[in-house]
Amino acid sequence: MSYYNIFLDFLSYIGSGAALFIKIIAVIISVMISVAYLVYMERKVIAAIQLRQGPNVVGPFGLLQPFADAVKLIIKEHIIPFKSNKICFLIAPIITFTLALLGWAVIPFGADVIVNDGYEVIIPNAIANINIGVLYILAISSLGVYGIIIAGWSSNSNYAFLGAIRSASQMISYEVSIGLTIVTVLLATGSLKLGEIVVARHNMPYWIDLLLLPMACIFFISALAETNRHPFDLPEAESELVSGYNVEYSSMPFALFFLGEYANMILINAMAVIFFFGGWYPPLNIGFLYIIPGIVWFVLKVVALLFCFIWIRATIPRYRYDQLMGLGWKVFLPISLLWVVLVSSILVYTDSLPSNNKQYVSHAMHK
């Protein structure tokens, strides 16, 4: 191989690396801006429900309020409790924030269509379109509890430790139900690639969508518990635990927890859109709606689910802890197990398993 070819290969490698780096930076910036304006949206929606105005001073209609809040958090004094484990105390919010961002690596925001040998090949727009995208995102979401446990233990506070224990047991309990709901989707699509799942779901008959609808409801409610959102925000119950596992945090460490929590909230709604609501495709497969880019539909669906999260926070009272655990283990777990068996049986009986009928995924990637 000549030096010229080696130089061309090196330039190609540098170019692909630069493109990947730009993708990563773009996703991180987009998530951070989304978190900032999700907080603004939450305050505005709750204010409207409670017949208030909400943020309306900083900028037109209060649109610059998120930046004012960010400046306030940055310039606040950073206090470390005297008897805390200082290293773990500082590492915990970094773990939570980092894991919240890592999950976005496999999320497809849309897709490009290219023609190859007469076929229209659909290429999902994701940082990494890996073969085990579902397993990756489940693993990343499961690791998030470590940051909370470390924060509660290292703070040397009874309130923080109790909040961390609550959060750990709650997240572990509802991850089982979330995993089983995703299993039903995998049975119907036969793929662990998030992009293939979206397109396979798009090409399925409507009766399979109706069959998976109860699992979508369980996934959505379990997502509230998984992200410690109302009415399952027991780890952060202000009336019981002051603020929960992050009670001793201030300034940027608190901001990292805050960013991680809301980034996880957006992420799990993006997962719901991918698994149950058609991803980047327009609703009901209406032809003229395809004029609108897929990423716009994806964002609109995620925003709609986030609005439901906020609406629930403003209207439904908090569960007791025993009710929370009972709902997860005594209601959602048996129903999820039963529905996995039911979906498997119906797919086998109707000869609709992906192993027997490949048209969904093959049509997905070679349309």
From Swiss-Prot:
PROSITE patterns assigned: COMPLEX1_ND1_1, COMPLEX1_ND1_2
Keyword Cell membrane applies: yes
Enzyme Commission number(s): 7.1.1.-
Enzyme class: translocase
Catalytic reaction(s) noted: a quinone + NADH + 5 H(+)(in) = a quinol + NAD(+) + 4 H(+)(out)
Predominant place of localization: membrane
Keywords from the named record: Cell inner membrane, Cell membrane, Membrane, NAD, Quinone, Translocase, Transmembrane, Transmembrane helix, Ubiquinone
Segments passing through the bilayer: 19-39, 87-107, 132-152, 178-198, 204-224, 266-286, 291-311, 328-348
GO cellular component, one term: plasma membrane
GO biological process, one term: aerobic respiration
Protein localization: Cell inner membrane
Assembly and binders: NDH-1 is composed of 14 different subunits. Subunits NuoA, H, J, K, L, M, N constitute the membrane sector of the complex.
The family this protein is said to belong to: Belongs to the complex I subunit 1 family.
Described purpose of this protein according to its UniProt entry: NDH-1 shuttles electrons from NADH, via FMN and iron-sulfur (Fe-S) centers, to quinones in the respiratory chain. The immediate electron acceptor for the enzyme in this species is believed to be ubiquinone. Couples the redox reaction to proton translocation (for every two electrons transferred, four hydrogen ions are translocated across the cytoplasmic membrane), and thus conserves the redox energy in a proton gradient. This subunit may bind ubiquinone.
UniProt-recorded name of the protein: NADH-quinone oxidoreductase subunit H
Native source organism of the sequence: Ehrlichia chaffeensis (strain ATCC CRL-10679 / Arkansas)
